[in-house]
Amino acid sequence: MDNLLVRGLTHKLYDKRKATAYELERVVKGYLENDETEKIRAVISQLANDFVYSPARGPNATFGGLIGLAAVAIALGPKIDSYMESILLPVLYCFNDSDSKIRYYACESMYNIGKVAKGEVFRYFNLIFDVLCKLFADTEITVKNGAELLDRLIKDIVMQQAATYMSSAEDIKNFKEGPVSSSIQDVPVMSTEQPRMHTFSLSELVPLLSERLYVINPNTRMFLVSWIRLLDSIPDLEFISYLPFLLDGLMNYLSDPNESIRIVTSNCLYDFLREIQKIAKVKYHILQRDEESEPDFFDSMVRRNMSDAELKEISDYVESSLRDGSFILEAHIQIDYKRILEIIIDHLGSSVPLIQEKALKWLFEFIYIAPKDVLLQIPKVLENLLPLMSNDENMRQSAKDLSQNLVILVSKIMDIEFSGSETNNKDNSLSVDFRSLIEVLQKLLSNDNEETRLCALEWVLLLQRRTGGKLINMHDPIFQTLLLQLSDPSDLVVSRTLELLAHIAISHKSVNLVPFLKSLLQMFAEDRKFLNSRGNLIIRQLCNYIEGERVYTSFAGILETEENLELASIMVEVLNNNLFTAPELYDLRKKLKQSAPKLQNIFTTLYTAWCHNSIAVFSLCLLSQNYEHAANLLSVFAEIEFNIDMLIQLDKLVQLIESPVFTYMRLQLLEPEKYPYLHKALYGILMLLPQSSAFRTLRDRLQCSSTPRTNTILANERLPRSRRDDPYWTDLLERLKAVQLSHQNNYREPIRATRLALAGALPSTPTATTISTTTSASGITTTASNSRDSFITRLPPTAALSTGARKKPKQ
């Protein structure tokens, strides 16, 4: 350039620089007409090196260089492709300048270059796009305005030419984009993208776009979302194939504090989902119309989520395209559903409600779009899904609906797997990782939220049922976790846990039932509060899920040989109370009342265990209408020491006699000639009771049924003794005596040990005898010395009373 042009371009006035640029444009056009390419390159080089890159020059020189480069580009017109690199790079360099005016003029220059170059900008698209990202975050309003203008131009070029433009330039084959790099590795070039040389390439843009998505600036975020929506709106680009690289960043935008960003991102994700659904529906329709291919269960899932109107719309679209010979783009697009699902599942565990809501929606739809991929991800899905049960009502309901749909899907695949039917022949690799699934559900059983624990139990129960009880046994870690769940504060959780444990216990020909009940008994032994708070509920629910007779006879077999006599007595008391009151045990009570020989084994089995609790045995005899044996038990009662617990049990028995369960027995009191031993047994209980409310209740009942005729029968007629010497009943009575003797010895052992310990501590030759005077609760004054005989006063009150009761009182 001559000195006149140089001075004009570096002038401080914009109008002077603009006029000089017009002159420069005229000069370059002359060079172009004369094919003087070297002079053109010299002008471009001078503008770049002497005006833009030179640090000695002031800002006016840079302004002149930028407007000069734009003038050269305009002069070159369609032939700019050979000079594109040398013109564009100096302009891009200016976008990093600290002077906002230079950045603005760079926008203006790039705009003019873009208007001329059009599709040629695709060769440097990543560089331009990266610059635009930074410009939208610029704090200077004029720069942002210039960036928006440039952005609109580039978008127009992309819309018009991105899918079709092919560059004719040959001088940049070895050009490498240095300033911009990406940390995203191994981005594949989709097979559906036609090879384009030096033109718009998604495989080069997407890594940069994916990386920039993690910026914080709201303006840049809006810019990025707008570009994503634009690229997706160009059908031939098949942009949807690259969604896995962008989805994570987009989902994060749903937590942006700026509402407008959340809205535009939500709409963008909605469009992506609709597009994926359409692709799946088109592929299903094409597969369905193919006579050689028959859609299987999974292929047909997409149809289940289509209305008749949608089905007709898709059918019309496919059929019309085939008639016209049009290319059906949706049929050829490949989408990585697995990677999309992984991202969605990760975001399901987000703490942001909008992200959770969007993830739920996508997962719900993917059950129909890609059921096989969902099945393979089931453990991770449930790990993040079930904790959502603790959220608000709407979120909880959405999570429940999704869980229910997953239940249907898993149930179907389990039916297929365990029946060995059609679908497995098509895809032998399809299988649910049950072990991983059980491990996840085991962790969820410890979740703080009740709904989550319940849902986890429902899932385990489903899996156990669908596998025919083969999935879980007593040796699996989850079994111990389930036992611990029995102490859950929620009755619903306990009930569901018992249903599952019952299913495990009765599977494999019930070989697990007795070990399970032993484990349960061990828990009761270790935690008495657990027995008191949950014992009745557990027993009743077990009898609801397993036949009551099996539960009780199995418990009886265990308790018969139980070495912990105190535990055995308490457990028999709990079992006995439920036997009389639980609706779940109605059938067992009915069987015990019958006198059929084949049902006698039930009574015998229970009796041998019930011997650990004498009052329970007596109750069992009344329930089974073995009144003679009940009357004979009174002789055993006379030999054992009654304590406060036994008196409380007698009080409860009287209450039971007044309850509906003993209606039949109360009516039998009206037939003393037929049931004489019933009167004797009840009168015996009356004599054992202290004069309390229970005593008066039973006395009144007996008086109501007592008539002169009854008294005559009981006084004068000899009671039948046909069964007294029967070996069967004799053995049962002896069994009771032996067990009760063991209990008495077990009760006295601590007292005896204390006596011996204290006796050993006394001096062998006492030096003095201390006499103490005490007053008993009855007001009787007694004296006791410090000799061994005085330890009788340290026995429990009931023991002392029973000892004295057997002594003949002085006259």
UniProtKB/Swiss-Prot annotation:
Residues 775-785 have a biased composition (Low complexity). HEAT repeats lie at residues 81-119, 122-160, 240-278, 334-372, 375-412, 431-469, 472-510. GO terms for cellular component: cytoplasm; endosome membrane; fungal-type vacuole membrane; PAS complex. Keywords: Cytoplasm, Membrane, Repeat, Vacuole. GO terms for biological process: phosphatidylinositol biosynthetic process. Residues 775-811 are annotated as: Disordered. InterPro entries: ARM-like, ARM-type_fold, Vac14, VAC14_Fig4p-bd. It is found in: Cytoplasm; Vacuole membrane. Its main location: cytoplasm. It comes from the Eukaryota. It is a peripheral membrane protein. Component of the PI(3,5)P2 regulatory complex, composed of ATG18, FIG4, FAB1, VAC14 and VAC7. VAC14 nucleates the assembly of the complex and serves as a scaffold. Belongs to the VAC14 family. PANTHER family: PROTEIN VAC14 HOMOLOG, TAX1 BINDING PROTEIN-RELATED. The PI(3,5)P2 regulatory complex regulates both the synthesis and turnover of phosphatidylinositol 3,5-bisphosphate (PtdIns(3,5)P2). Regulates the synthesis of PtdIns(3,5)P2 by positive activation of FAB1 and by controlling FIG4 localization. This is Protein VAC14 homolog.
